């Protein structure tokens, strides 16, 4: 009886989303109570504290650079299928999430820049609201279970991948991160080998994964966020092979699904959501920095996505994914305002660890904006999506 109930609970379409947010809530509570020392001991294990060098192996590093690369591998596999055989299988449909991602980066940056124009010291933070935390956005979608159409979730995943790539480019160009040319060259060579394997219809999945691990190491050493390796490997694993119905990409995607939903995403949430609000005062909520970030996330993200895609559709540069309308896009675009971990990462680069007060203000804006965007996006989608009628959602994240 208990086993049957547990099985039903685990296999519920919304179980992954519930688990992710439960892990995030546990992290926030621990980080702001007497359990803070225990929380830090867990996420920085085996290091002693957050003061360890970024290269020091810890649970946080393992999750963010290692396990999240696996998550992006699963997302990359899914988006590749949709680009070749699914909801994005034409040029105008594939262009839709790309244009949406562009609008979702430009508009928040503009709004932030306008709201902080009077404070030159804050100009460096323009990219903070341009980022989307794909893990938490997918987590909110998972809470809606099978009500989410396949095409809408695929749109979100494709947009988030492009957004993440955009964030990597922004960080490399504007935030003076040191890149290692030799490691980049090695990564390029590995990508070239995998591309040749794909073209030659090499079917050994283990060989792709082995080279993928090498690519991950090269990208990690290059100074670029290592999760990029997951996207690249997902795009290079063959979807179909001649003279066979076997799909290596689909087989790997289905195998990864439960690991992503029930282990990787909850661990990511727990390791990254523990934001300490110590020292935050009510007055912090109405200063220009948090207001600019929150406005960029809550207003800029959906506004940019909707405006850019509406113009693109009008000019016939893009087409809406099948089965959804602009009201679905507008509601899903609100979820892209969940900046959270990527926004915090950019804030640390923009203002440096030697300016703790500014970092606290930035985190207030990121956390408040992300929570508002998540709640509004969830409520809007819940209002416009039909009640579940069986299956219909895609696997990653829910």
Curated annotation (Swiss-Prot):
It catalyses: Na(+)(in) + 2 H(+)(out) = Na(+)(out) + 2 H(+)(in). GO terms for biological process: regulation of pH. It is found in: Cell inner membrane. GO terms for cellular component: plasma membrane. GO terms for molecular function: sodium:proton antiporter activity. The chain crosses the membrane at residues 9-29, 57-77, 95-115, 124-144, 154-174, 177-197, 204-224, 226-246, 255-275, 288-308, 329-349, 359-379. It holds the Pfam family Na_H_antiport_1. It is a multi-pass membrane protein. Keywords: Antiport, Cell inner membrane, Cell membrane, Ion transport, Membrane, Sodium, Sodium transport, Transmembrane, Transmembrane helix, Transport. InterPro entries: Na/H_antiporter_dom_sf, NhaA. Na(+)/H(+) antiporter that extrudes sodium in exchange for external protons. Belongs to the NhaA Na(+)/H(+) (TC 2.A.33) antiporter family. This is Na(+)/H(+) antiporter NhaA. It comes from Sodalis glossinidius (strain morsitans). The lineage of its organism: Bacteria, Pseudomonadati, Pseudomonadota, Gammaproteobacteria, Enterobacterales. The gene is nhaA.
């Amino acid at each position: 009886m208990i086993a049957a109930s547990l099985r039903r609970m685990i296999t519920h379409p919304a179980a992954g989303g519930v688990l992710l947010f439960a892990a995030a809530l546990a992290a926030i509570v621990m980080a702001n109570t007497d359990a803070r020392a225990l929380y830090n001991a867990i996420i920085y294990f085996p290091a002693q504290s957050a003061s360890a060098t970024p290269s020091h192996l810890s649970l946080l590093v393992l999750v963010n650079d290692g396990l999240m690369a696996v998550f992006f591998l699963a997302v990359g596999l899914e988006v590749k299928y949709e680009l070749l055989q699914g909801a994005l299988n034409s040029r105008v449909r594939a262009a839709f999430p790309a244009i949406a991602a562009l609008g979702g980066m430009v508009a928040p940056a503009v709004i932030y820049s306008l709201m902080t124009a009077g404070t030159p010291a804050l100009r460096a933070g323009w990219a903070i609201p341009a980022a989307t935390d794909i893990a938490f956005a997918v987590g909110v979608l998972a809470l809606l279970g099978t009500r989410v159409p396949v095409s809408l979730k695929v749109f979100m995943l494709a947009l988030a991948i492009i957004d993440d790539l955009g964030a990597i480019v922004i960080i490399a160009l504007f935030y003076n991160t040191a890149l290692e040319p030799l490691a980049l060259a090695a990564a390029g060579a590995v990508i070239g080998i995998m591309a040749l394997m794909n073209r030659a219809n090499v079917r050994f999945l283990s060989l792709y994964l082995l080279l993928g691990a090498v690519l991950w190491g090269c990208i990690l050493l290059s100074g670029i966020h290592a999760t990029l390796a997951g996207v690249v490997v997902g795009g290079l694993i063959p979807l179909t092979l001649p003279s066979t119905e076997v799909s290596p990409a689909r087989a790997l995607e289905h195998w990864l699904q439960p690991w992503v939903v029930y282990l990787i995403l909850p661990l990511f949430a727990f390791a990254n959501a523990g934001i300490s609000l110590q020292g935050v005062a009510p007055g912090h909520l109405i200063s220009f920095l948090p207001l600019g970030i929150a406005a960029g996330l809550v207003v800029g993200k959906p506004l940019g996505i909707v405006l850019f895609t509406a113009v693109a559709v009008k000019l016939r540069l893009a087409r809406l994914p099948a089965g959804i309308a602009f009201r679905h896009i507008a509601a899903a675009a609100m979820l892209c305002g969940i900046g959270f971990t990527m926004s915090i990462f950019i804030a640390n680069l923009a203002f440096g660890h030697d300016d703790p007060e500014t970092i606290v203000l930035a985190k207030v804006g990121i956390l408040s904006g992300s929570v508002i965007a998540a709640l509004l996006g969830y409520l809007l989608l819940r209002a416009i999506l039909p009640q579940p009628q069986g299956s219909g959602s895609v696997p990653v994240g829910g």
